[in-house]
Amino acid sequence: MAVKIKLTRLGKIRNPQYRIQVADARTRREGRAIEVIGRYHPKEEPSLIEIDSERAQYWLSVGAQPTDPVLALLKITGDWQKFKGLPGAEGTLKVKEPKPSKLDLFNAALAEADGAPTGEAIQQKKKKAPKKAEAAEAEAPAEEPAAESADAASE
């Protein structure tokens, strides 16, 4: 059975997303796959290319033929060079930079506005002490001087 590594199209109009799959060469583009080994999103910046390198190496070793678009992707990831034993097996895949967290952006904007942040970005409300505790504290100091004056009178 002739096996090909090819792309299956997914996604909306003008926003293609592809699965990289291993399938019989005689099946249609969206036909039944033997195995899905990766995905490719060309519209993202930089393009998302995820290929399970171990499975791609296996299928290439047993004779699966990649189509031209898949061959280009395998060269970008370095899997084709690794399979052929050529230099440059690390590939030329670009990785997206991680986004800064929203808290960091908020603190940076706050620092620009009026200076460095004072602790947390949002201050919590102070909880009031229960009214009974306040009343007990207010009565206690008033009773102590009266007790002292009673002790002084008895002496």
Curated annotation (Swiss-Prot):
Compositionally biased spans, kind Acidic residues: 136-146
Annotated disulfide bonds: none
This protein's record includes keyword Ribonucleoprotein: yes
SUPFAM superfamilies to which the protein is assigned, alphabetical: Ribosomal protein S16 (SSF54565)
Keywords: Ribonucleoprotein, Ribosomal protein
UniProt xrefs under PANTHER family: 30S RIBOSOMAL PROTEIN S16 (PTHR12919), SMALL RIBOSOMAL SUBUNIT PROTEIN BS16M (PTHR12919:SF20)
Gene Ontology molecular functions: structural constituent of ribosome
An annotated GO cellular component: cytoplasm
Biological process annotations from GO: translation
Highest taxon above the source species: Bacteria
Transmembrane segments: none
Pfam families: Ribosomal_S16 (PF00886)
Keyword Ribonucleoprotein tagged: yes
Name this polypeptide is given: Small ribosomal subunit protein bS16
